[in-house]
């Protein structure tokens, strides 16, 4: 991210470049409580998110404190500073770096006289802007409705102008009346539609499993270069833009490996710090494609100054999805911007997806990981060990199975890794 210089005016950060801005962009002031170094990084991301949503960031106000004011998010003195700044700079909205309650939103709007958008609403707004598929649009709407339901009081003013500006994209007035029963009914209807789409996805997954076509899922922090890698490997035309969450709807393409074997390569939505819980829940069926993948390619922006922290964020999301134990190759991207490139190993591959550097080595690593030497092994699973049995069904190639009073007897073709993990269930 390009570093932007700011000047200090009574502890307010204002962009150097203050020429008259085009009025088609909303003028935004960012507000954040800083209690740790990580908060500084999330504030940098908030600026990127605001720009991605279409705002022009004209200033940033921060307050160093441990707790959040229950009424206004920031303290009384800072609120007065912010009010003066909003008036002087003719700001259109204030974007807050945390999730607010309905009461906090209402109190801030009453005090400042401008629209208030919190971090969660901003991310949901970007997702609404990016969604293209039927499923993607339904998932975003579901997340927005669940976010707005407990905030009807605070968002009352915003609901009257839905569809016009940041934080107001998505369901319009006809869909989103200020009526909890109506919203709950809409949530139920969307969830039923998504269940039907999930059944279709499961059928596709079972068909791929039956045809023994491995699935490789590309995961990573947002804007790490996942779609660029998909395009470079498959010749696809997935949407690529240097903005956060440029890809929302998952893309799946056929990939031919050096041996001629074919796999399915999927691109997924990027992860980010403070990813809204409602969004994760709404996109659970899409994100679960990661859980059922045979191999993960974790794309990492090697130029990012907080690379290690972003890796931890991705690993946390993978853990929440139940995919932390899925075989993984770390793909360190953007080496064209480095002066010295590490050599790497079988699990750490250094590439430039943009310049197509290192892709041959990556393809070899994918093939080596997916098609390891296998052997036929017999297992016996007691009926209470369904987790281990399902693991074998997902990861191995079942040749035959039998159910009797002892449990489930399975003969399967497995890798050494699977055999070692299930060694307690092996029978001679």
UniProtKB/Swiss-Prot annotation:
Transmembrane segments: none annotated. Keywords: Cytoplasm, GTP-binding, Magnesium, Metal-binding, Nucleotide-binding. GO terms for molecular function: GTP binding; GTPase activity; metal ion binding; ribosome binding. SUPFAM superfamilies: P-loop containing nucleoside triphosphate hydrolases (SSF52540). It is found in: Cytoplasm. Residues 214-374 form the Hflx-type G domain. It holds the Pfam family MMR_HSR1. Signal peptide: none annotated. Gene3D superfamilies: 6.10.250.2860, GTPase HflX, N-terminal domain, P-loop containing nucleotide triphosphate hydrolases. Its cofactor is Mg(2+). GTP binds at residues 220-227, 245-249, 267-270, 333-336, 352-354. Mg(2+) binds at residues 227, 247. The keyword Cytoplasm applies. The keyword Endoplasmic reticulum does not apply. GO terms for cellular component: cytoplasm. Its main location: cytoplasm. GTPase that associates with the 50S ribosomal subunit and may have a role during protein synthesis or ribosome biogenesis. Belongs to the TRAFAC class OBG-HflX-like GTPase superfamily. HflX GTPase family. Monomer. Associates with the 50S ribosomal subunit. This is GTPase HflX. It comes from Caldanaerobacter subterraneus subsp. tengcongensis (strain DSM 15242 / JCM 11007 / NBRC 100824 / MB4). The gene is hflX.
